[in-house]
Amino acid sequence: SVQNKNEDYVASFKGSDFSLKDMDNNIINQNSFDGPLTAIFFGFTHCPDVCPMTLNKMDIVLSKLNKENENLKFFFISVDPERDTPGVIKDYLSNFDNKFVGITGDPGKIFLLYKSWGVISKKIFLDNGDYNIDHSTPVILLKNGKYISMISHRDDIKKSIKIIKKYL
């Protein structure tokens, strides 16, 4: 995946107004990110490594936080809306114990959303005609819709818990 930008770089981005749909066809917009603590992660269901590892790590983190995680919302936002339909995302996220909310929609709107958070995403075409996506992988933490911190894919479970507990 693309090297994670440093935290100051990600913190310089503020998100943007948007309207997309989640995997259950509910409208998701910038107000959906309001609340005590929200985590957003941009990824895709065909990702061979970093996305499933990050989601698995966050699943364990949320389980270890147990009752403390009740105020935490976690959104998985697809950078591959062409393949990641609501049904595909719902099926993919059903592999995890915690309630991750999958978001997909119009590719142009998705592009603007991930750019607004400083996330980089690029299609890499393979010899067989298929493609992979190279993208940056921070788990971005928000409080009342505003950036407060991030978890890198390099942060282990213990460090990830410590980062989240700081804001719960």
Q: What is each model feature region?
A:
Residues 30-54, 58:
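Short active-site neighborhood of thiol/selenol oxidoreductases, capturing the structured segment around
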Residues 71-84, 99-108:
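Thiol-based oxidoreductase modules, predominantly thioredoxin-like and allied folds used
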Residues 90-136:
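Short, internal strand/loop/helix patches
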